[in-house]
Amino acid sequence: MAKLRVGLLFGGRSGEHEVSLNSAKAIATALQSGENPQKYDIIPIYIQKNGVWQAGDTAQQVLNDAKPLPCEDATSQQLWTFPPQVSEVDVWFPILHGPNGEDGTLQGLLTLMQTPFVGSGVLGSAVGMDKIAMKMAFAQAGLPQVKYIAVDRAQIWSNPCVFPKLCDEIEQRLGYPCFVKPANLGSSVGIAKVRSRSELEKALDSAASYDRRIVIETGVKAREVECAVLGNENPKASVIGEITYNSDFYDYEAKYTDGMAQMHIPAQLPDAIVTQIQDMAIQAFKAVDGAGLARVDFFYVEDSQEVFINEINTLPGFTAFSMYPQLWKETGVPFAELVDQLIQLALERKQ
């Protein structure tokens, strides 16, 4: 049987470019482990920070080094020129995080190519990226969430008479502390925890510079726990993991600085809470029309035994030390087998 050619697509234009390189390197290693070399050949395809696609030795070198290529602004012609290796791909494994990678835009392009790909489609990716659309989907599915308010940039920037009223509403409905989040950025980029009116005004202005849509959530004193989901129509949930960190909240620095955050797998939780979180993770996955993989994040309030869904990540970090593969390793699915299963799920979904 001929080996499948896996297009490992990495890099991208978002601020999570470097995270993507590390994820891709780990996946490439997994594709060269166990029985995978008998099944798959890797075609590395690197998207530079300017959006230009590279293949061959250039892409392989970036994959080996996990360091981005320097680049200049690209022309329209360069952006619409794909390497010839693209036509050789049997199945895509896109591992681009953030905007233009996991928000449905790339998934739309791969759908037009009529080639199967790992992960959610256009709808699941788009809903899973936009925190406001995601919350609406969760609400429709009856999943408990913390209180929130959704606003847009125009409410913050357009009229000096409107902005104070907006801040009044946030204070009255949510109180302090609360979190201000751009709706469409990953890795906690642009998120601020605020405790006063002045901090709120500053955080809203900052979030509006990142995104047109902004969500403000009430703060809760809770443990942050995560569950991995794997599958298509009949997904499975992993054991639960917990994140603890040495910062005010789980921000970008805490996520990507060694020693600032610790993963506890499995999390020490009552059995009933574990089952509840696993069930909610699968419900959330189905609510956004997920496929292949997702990591679902929760708040567990120990005092009241309440569980609130925080968000879903349809293309989570995939380094050997990332939460998603670690959760499956603890559940009994090692890294190389996990990568194989994801490729098979992509092929199954295309049939």
UniProtKB/Swiss-Prot annotation:
Pathway: Cell wall biogenesis; peptidoglycan biosynthesis. Residues 135-344 form the ATP-grasp domain. One of its GO terms (cellular component) is cytosol. PROSITE patterns: ATP_GRASP (PS50975), DALA_DALA_LIGASE_1 (PS00843), DALA_DALA_LIGASE_2 (PS00844). Binds 2 magnesium or manganese ions per subunit. It comes from the Bacteria. Keywords: ATP-binding, Cell shape, Cell wall biogenesis/degradation, Cytoplasm, Ligase, Magnesium, Manganese, Metal-binding, Nucleotide-binding, Peptidoglycan synthesis. Pfam families: Dala_Dala_lig_C, Dala_Dala_lig_N. Transmembrane segments: none annotated. Its cofactor is Mg(2+); Mn(2+). One of its GO terms (molecular function) is metal ion binding. InterPro entries: ATP-grasp, ATP_grasp_subdomain_1, D-Ala_lig_Van_CS, D_ala_D_ala, Dala_Dala_lig_C, Dala_Dala_lig_N, PreATP-grasp_dom_sf. GO terms for biological process: cell wall organization; peptidoglycan biosynthetic process; regulation of cell shape. It is found in: Cytoplasm. Its EC number is 6.3.2.4. Cell wall formation. Belongs to the D-alanine--D-alanine ligase family. PANTHER family: D-ALANINE--D-ALANINE LIGASE, D-ALANINE--D-ALANINE LIGASE A. This is D-alanine--D-alanine ligase. It comes from Rippkaea orientalis (strain PCC 8801 / RF-1) (Cyanothece sp. (strain PCC 8801)). The lineage of its organism: Bacteria, Bacillati, Cyanobacteriota, Cyanophyceae, Oscillatoriophycideae. The gene is ddl.
